[in-house]
Curated annotation (Swiss-Prot):
Name of the protein: ilv operon leader peptide
Biological role stated in the UniProt entry: This protein is involved in control of the biosynthesis of isoleucine, leucine, and valine.
Upper taxonomic lineage: Bacteria, Pseudomonadati, Pseudomonadota, Gammaproteobacteria, Enterobacterales
Ranges annotated as spanning the membrane: none
Organism this protein belongs to: Escherichia coli (strain K12)
Domain of life: Bacteria
UniProtKB keywords: Amino-acid biosynthesis, Branched-chain amino acid biosynthesis, Leader peptide
GO biological processes: L-valine biosynthetic process
Length: 32
């Protein structure tokens, strides 16, 4: 897989991935 192909696949999913990261951080922060 080339870098351009990898970027083409990652760029569209970046916003949703960021949302998932934020949710995980919030859940972990509220866990204790």
């Amino acid at each position: 897989m080339t870098t351009s192909m990898l970027n083409a696949k990652l760029l569209p999913t970046a916003p949703s991935a960021a949302v998932v990261v934020v949710r995980v951080v919030v859940v972990v922060g509220n866990a204790p």
